[in-house]
Design a protein with these regions (language model features):
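Short amphipathic alpha-helical interface segments
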Residues: 10-22
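A short alpha-helical element within helix-turn-helix/winged-helix DNA-binding domains
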Residues: 26-35
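Key DNA-contact positions within bacterial/archaeal DNA-binding proteins
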Residues: 40
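Basic amphipathic alpha-helical segments that dock to polyanions
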Residues: 45-50
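Beta-hairpin "wing" of winged helix-turn-helix
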Residues: 54-67
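C-terminal regulatory/oligomerization modules of transcriptional regulators
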Residues: 76, 94-145
Length: 145
């Protein structure tokens, strides 16, 4: 499994919104500038996040985006599942309507299922709040006189 650029950028966008949650609605151009991501690329990610009601949006002069919930209520796993379509390490574990024809006899299937559980448990155990705290700690450690 390889996390796509879309997934990584969505996570950076959500973390940026968490960082600036006290600023009200945040313009996409500001997120793009701070994160050094193309605004056009972020415009492709926003509909995916918006449809899932994890963002609040408003239009107009003071328009922009903000988190719909508190940062501790979002997991990295949730965000990546929305943008990646799943976290399965192999195609046969993806949520396809047609199961793998070798499913009943595959000796490696239990291993892949175990890996998927480990990945999901790990990513579901990290919240945006956790990432915010790590970011703050890193910034404090980077302080130079």
């Amino acid at each position: 499994m390889k996390i796509s650029t879309k997934g990584r950028y969505a996570l950076r966008m959500m973390l940026d919104l968490a960082t600036h949650q006290g600023d009200g609605y945040v313009a996409l151009k500001d997120i793009a500038q701070r994160q050094e991501i193309s605004k056009k690329y972020l415009e492709q990610i926003v509909p995916t996040l918006g449809k899932s009601n994890i963002l609040r949006t408003t239009r107009g002069y003071q328009g922009g985006y903000r988190l719909a919930r508190a940062p501790q209520d979002y997991t990295v796993g949730e965000i990546l599942r929305l943008t990646e379509g799943g976290l399965a390490p192999v195609a046969c574990l993806d949520q396809h309507p047609i199961p793998c024809p070798r499913c009943g006899e595959c000796a490696t299937l239990p291993m892949w299922e175990g890996l998927e559980r480990v990945i999901c448990n790990y990513l579901d155990g990290i919240t945006l709040q956790d990432l915010l705290e790590q970011q703050t700690a890193r910034a404090a450690n980077d302080y130079v006189i």
